[in-house]
Curated annotation (Swiss-Prot):
This is Uncharacterized protein aq_1022.
Length: 344
C-alpha cells in the first residue's frame, strides 16, 4: 500500500507512529507560512507559522506532535477533528526538538538548544507535561537525535563535532538524569546516529558513517559492536524495527546520483538477508518507519515534493547490500553537563 499527498505545494513527512489503530504522521508544508503538517490516520491539517515537526507519539487514540515554532517547542495534542491542547516550552536560546518518546511514567524530549553553539539536551516530563528533570551538555557542538529507555537507563544518541567532521555520540543516563557514560564513535568523515530503539530488550542505534572519500555507509550499533553496510553511493539508516525473526532498517540510498528509499532485512546476528528499494526517476526518501508503516517524500511524481505514506512489503524492488570492513574509533568523551533553567 502506498498513499500520496499532493496539494501542489511542497509536503514532506518526517515521522510516523502507529498504535491502537491510530496512525500519526508529522512533517512540513512549505508554503508562504511554512506550516507544520499533522496527520491523523489519513486526515491532514497544518499548525503554526514558521513551524515544522520531526516527531510524534500516540496518546490513547490521540496524537501528540512535537512542533518547533520560531525556536520554541510546542507539544500539540490532536485528533482527526483538530487540535485539543498545546503545551509550550521556551528557552533563552533557540530550541530544536528531534524526538519525543512516550514511556510508562511520562515523556522524554531530546534535541538541541543554541546560544553560541548547539548543545544537546534531554528532558523528562511527567504525564501532566511537567518537567521532572533536564540535562544540557556543554562541549563544542552536539545534538541528540533520538532516545530510548531500558530498565533504569536512558540512551541518548546523536552527533558531536570533531574538527571539521562529526562523530556519532552516545550518552547513557540514569532514570533521574545522572550522566553515567558518554563516548563517541567515528572515523575520518561525518558519522552520526539518527535513531535508537529498545527492541525487546536489545537497544539498537542506526545512522550513517562516512569514509575519507565521502562515501556514506549504513551504521548499525547494538551497544556491543558496530556494523557497516554499503548499498550505493550514499547510504543513511533512519529507523530500525523488528520484523519477524529479523530486523528491518529503513532509510535512504543513492544509485547513480538518484536517491531512493531503502529497506534492509538483517538477521538477529546482523547479517544481511534481503534489501528492497522504493523510488522513481528523481529524489525519493524514506524518512521513518514504525510497525511497518513508513513515511517520507518524493519529487518524482509531480513538480513539487509530495508526501508518501505506505506499508512495507517484500514486493518492492530487490537490491544488493554488502557488509563493509572499515574501522571506527570509540573514544570516551568528557562532557560537561549541567542543569539550567534556560533549557525547557
Amino acid at each position: 500500500m502506498l498513499i500520496l499527498l499532493d496539494t501542489g505545494i511542497h509536503e514532506v513527512a518526517f515521522f510516523t507512529k502507529y498504535e491502537n489503530y491510530t496512525l500519526c504522521t508529522v512533517g512540513r508544508r512549505e508554503n508562504s507560512k511554512e506550516e507544520a503538517l499533522l496527520g491523523y490516520n489519513l486526515r491532514f491539517f497544518t499548525f503554526g507559522n514558521s513551524s515544522y515537526s520531526y516527531t510524534v507519539e500516540t496518546v490513547k487514540r490521540k496524537c501528540l506532535a512535537g512542533v518547533v515554532t520560531k525556536g520554541n517547542i510546542n507539544l500539540v495534542l490532536y485528533t482527526g477533528n483538530g487540535i485539543q491542547n498545546v503545551y509550550e516550552f521556551s528557552s533563552n536560546g533557540e530550541l530544536m526538538l528531534w524526538q519525543l518518546l512516550k514511556t510508562e511514567k511520562g515523556y522524554f524530549l531530546v534535541g538541541g538548544v543554541k546560544r553560541n553553539n548547539w548543545d544537546a539536551f534531554v528532558a523528562f516530563l511527567d504525564r501532566n507535561f511537567k518537567v521532572k528533570w533536564k540535562k544540557r551538555l556543554d562541549f563544542l557542538e552536539e545534538y541528540f537525535y533520538s532516545v530510548a529507555e531500558k530498565g533504569n537507563k536512558v540512551y541518548a544518541v546523536g552527533r558531536i563535532k570533531r574538527g571539521k567532521n562529526w562523530d556519532a555520540l552516545v550518552c547513557i543516563f540514569s532514570d533521574n538524569g545522572k550522566l553515567l557514560e558518554s563516548y563517541s564513535i567515528g572515523s575520518e568523515g561525518k558519522d552520526y546516529f539518527r535513531f535508537v530503539k529498545n527492541l525487546g530488550g536489545e537497544v539498537i542505534a542506526v545512522g550513517r558513517s562516512e569514509d575519507k572519500f565521502g562515501d556514506s555507509d549504513f551504521l548499525i550499533y547494538d551497544f556491543k559492536n558496530y556494523y557497516l553496510y554499503d548499498s550505493g553511493e550514499y547510504d543513511y539508516a533512519r529507523a530500525v524495527n523488528s520484523y519477524g525473526n529479523s530486523y528491518v532498517i529503513a532509510g535512504e540510498t543513492r544509485f547513480k546520483g538518484n536517491n531512493d528509499g531503502i529497506f534492509i532485512l538483517l538477521s538477529k546476528n546482523f547479517r544481511p538477508v534481503r534489501a528492497f528499494k522504493i523510488g522513481w526517476e528523481n529524489t525519493d526518501a524514506v524518512r521513518f518507519m514504525d510497525n511497518l508503516f513508513f513515511t517520507g517524500y518524493t519529487y518524482s511524481l509531480s513538480f513539487s515534493a509530495d508526501l508518501i505514506l505506505g506499508v512495507f512489503s517484500e514486493d518492492f524492488e530487490k537490491v544488493d547490500v554488502k557488509k563493509v570492513n572499515r574501522v571506527l574509533k570509540k573514544e570516551k568523551v568528557h562532557l560537561r553537563d549541567f542543569l539550567s533553567s534556560s533549557c525547557v
